[in-house]
Design a protein with these regions (language model features):
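Short loop->beta-strand "edge-of-pocket" segments that line small-molecule binding or catalytic clefts
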Residues: 1-19
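N-terminal hydrophobic or amphipathic helices and topogenic motifs
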Residues: 4, 23-26, 90, 107-130
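Conserved mixed alpha/beta catalytic, RNA-binding, or beta-rich assembly cores of soluble enzyme
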Residues: 5-10, 43-46, 51, 57, ...
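Short beta-strand-to-loop elements that line the ligand-binding cleft
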Residues: 25-48
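Short, glycine/charged-rich beta-strand-loop motifs at protein surfaces that mediate ligand recognition
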Residues: 38-42, 49-51, 84-90
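A ligand-binding cleft/hinge motif common to bilobed small-molecule-binding domains
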Residues: 50-79
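Periplasmic-binding protein-like
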Residues: 69-102, 122-124
């Protein structure tokens, strides 16, 4: 396998799943990881994972559907991720901020997204931390 770099969301997903597996099997997380050939080999991007698979350097890696498909690779859905825009209030209230939100919430924008990437149903909803 090829792993993702420590600190990436994908690596957190992998490690969480491996912790669950270790618990189910009644073994330590470190034991599971030590038996996975390539666990300590890291890629910094989804594209790097796909390239390693495409070049037959590894059998498997965790990445996103759009990158796998653009490389003609098969994939198995593991999880969905959510991302947020973090903005200053002054940006949100500016014309460019309003324009950005209008684009992100538009049907036209959503129809242009590659397979495997979708707009969140609550896109445009504000979460205030004041």
């Amino acid at each position: 396998m090829i792993n993702r770099n420590r600190g990436s969301g994908t690596r957190v997903l992998i490690d969480n799943r491996l912790h669950q597996l270790a618990e189910e099997l009644g073994v330590g997380f470190d034991k599971i990881c030590s038996e996975l050939d390539g666990y300590d080999t890291e890629a910094r991007t989804h594209s790097a994972v796909a390239a390693a698979v495409k070049l037959n350097r590894v059998d498997v890696g965790i990445g996103i559907r759009s990158v796998a498909e653009s490389n003609g690779q098969k994939f198995i859905h593991l999880a969905d991720e959510e991302y947020d825009f973090i903005m200053q209030r002054s940006f949100v209230e500016s014309k460019i901020g309003t324009d950005l939100l209008n684009v992100l919430c538009s049907d036209e924008f959503n129809s242009c997204l590659p397979p495997g990437i979708t707009s969140y149903k609550r896109t445009g909803e504000f979460v205030d931390f004041d």
